[in-house]
Curated annotation (Swiss-Prot):
Annotated Mg(2+) 1 binding sites: 234, 237-238, 303
Record text on activity regulation: May be regulated by calcium ions.
Name of the protein in its database record: Magnesium transporter MRS2 homolog, mitochondrial
Primary gene name: Mrs2
Positions in the Mitochondrial intermembrane compartment: 351-361
Species of provenance: Mus musculus
Length: 434
């Protein structure tokens, strides 16, 4: 015990303040766990403030480290910016920095391969499968355009359209109208291009399959038609989603008002345009125009689908006819075999080990053979004629046409009988009885 009492005196002086700090931290933890609080109160306020400062520093360092870790793993967007004059700038931004600059939330920049048009904090967010865009009153941002083959449209066509030099209907309107029309026009042209590629391929394949010169169906053509049918189904789904997304906007008047971004930032835009139409109505007309274009594409795709279904029915009919021919041939051969077997019993009778005087005559062999073949032929012909009568299509009954004058006379008699009053007939019978 005396050695333990002398141990603090043997420790270096530099270790004593550290030991005091450790003791204070241990007592703080005991007080938090429900231990004695009296020794903690008896400690000096200097030790408690030192422990509190150490905890704050540790907490701040942990939060800074977590933020640095999240920033290091954040998604980086390749952004292309288009302003009102058509100037183009490209840069890279992390997802956290980008939604802070645009006053958006993280879920607003979570782009899935779906078609949607939404508004948030005076911003328009457009998702068109692989095309991701954010529209503000001053600029248009295209995100992650790399590896999408969009360079020609982005850097040659889109700047002139946004600057009002292209063939856009909304060039005298605010910037967001031109941006929305340019994106919708690009998507409609993309869908139309896919349809124009599929249409000649499908028609060529159908012509080859339905050609009456070919008695059999080429399986390679059927495989090509199956692949084109799948592509057509995907195109129909994309067109349907595009129509539904635009129809949702047309059904909500508040959404149409929110799409007019400049209306909320510039008070002069509240006035009606030169044509006397409000900007919300012009947005509605714009969306209705592209909805009609999508409807036309849907009708063309539906016509192709109807052609495929009709050709499929024709192919099935041809296959059924070939199958019927094969079944008829099989039935004819079966009848011939039955006829030969029936008259072959005569040969079986002569083939038995029985003696008769007919075996000695050579003419009997040829006579019996001739009778067998003639009888088999006659029976086969009778069976074939019976089969032909059964397979013939029934003749529809002949309707005898009555003369026109007879029909008119009968009709007049019916009209007279229907117009004759019942009371008059009753009175005549009473008078006749009197």
């Amino acid at each position: 015990m005396e050695c333990l009492r002398c141990l603090p005196g043997l420790l270096p002086r530099a270790a004593q303040p550290r030991r005091a700090l450790w003791t204070a931290v241990a007592r703080l933890s005991l007080a938090a766990c429900g231990g004695r609080a009296t020794p903690l109160r008896s400690r000096s306020p200097k030790a408690s403030s030192t422990a509190r400062a150490a905890g704050d520093v540790l907490r701040f360092r942990t939060s800074d480290a977590s933020q640095a870790t999240l920033a290091s793993v954040a998604q980086v967007f390749a952004v292309t910016k288009f302003d009102k004059e058509g100037n183009v700038t490209s840069f890279e931004r992390k997802k956290t920095e980008l939604y802070h600059e645009l006053a958006l939330q993280a879920r607003d920049l979570r782009f899935q391969h779906v078609m949607s048009i939404t508004t948030r904090n005076n911003r328009i967010i457009m998702r068109m499968e692989y095309l991701k865009a954010v529209i503000t009153p001053e600029c248009l941002l295209i995100l992650d355009y790399r590896n999408l083959n969009l360079e020609h449209w982005l850097f040659r066509e889109l700047p002139s359209q946004l600057a009002g030099e292209g063939q856009l209907v909304t060039y005298p309107l605010p910037f967001e109208f031109r941006a929305i029309e340019a994106l919708l026009q690009y998507w409609i042209s993309t869908l139309r291009g896919r349809l124009s590629v599929l249409q000649p391929l499908i028609l060529e394949t159908l012509d080859a399959l339905v050609d009456p010169k070919h008695s059999s169906v080429d399986r390679s053509k059927l495989h090509v038609l199956l692949q084109n049918g799948k592509s057509l189904s995907e195109l129909e789904t994309d067109i349907k989603i595009f129509k539904e997304s635009i129809l949702e906007l047309l059904d909500e008047e508040e959404m149409l008002e929110e799409l007019c971004l400049t209306k909320w930032s510039d008070p002069h835009v509240f006035e009606k345009s030169s044509t006397g139409i409000d900007h919300a109505e012009e947005m509605e007309l714009l969306l209705e125009n592209y909805y009609r274009l999508a409807e036309d594409l849907s009708n063309e795709a539906r016509e192709l689908r109807v052609l495929i279904d009709d050709s499929q029915s024709i192919i099935f009919i041809n296959l059924d006819s070939h199958r019927n021919v094969m079944m008829r041939l099989n039935l004819q051969l079966t009848m011939g075999t039955f006829s030969l077997s029936l008259f072959g019993l005569m040969g079986v009778a002569f083939g038995m080990n029985l003696e008769s005087s007919l075996e000695e005559d050579h003419r009997v062999f040829w006579l019996v053979t001739g009778i067998m073949f003639m009888g088999s032929g006659l029976i086969w012909r009778r069976l074939l004629s019976f089969l032909g009568r059964q397979l013939e299509a029934p003749v529809p009954p002949v309707m005898t046409s009555l003369p026109k004058k007879t029909l008119l006379a009968n009709r007049r008699m019916d009209v007279k009988n229907s117009l004759r009053p019942e009371g008059l007939g009753a009175s005549r019978t009473i008078l006749a009885s009197r």
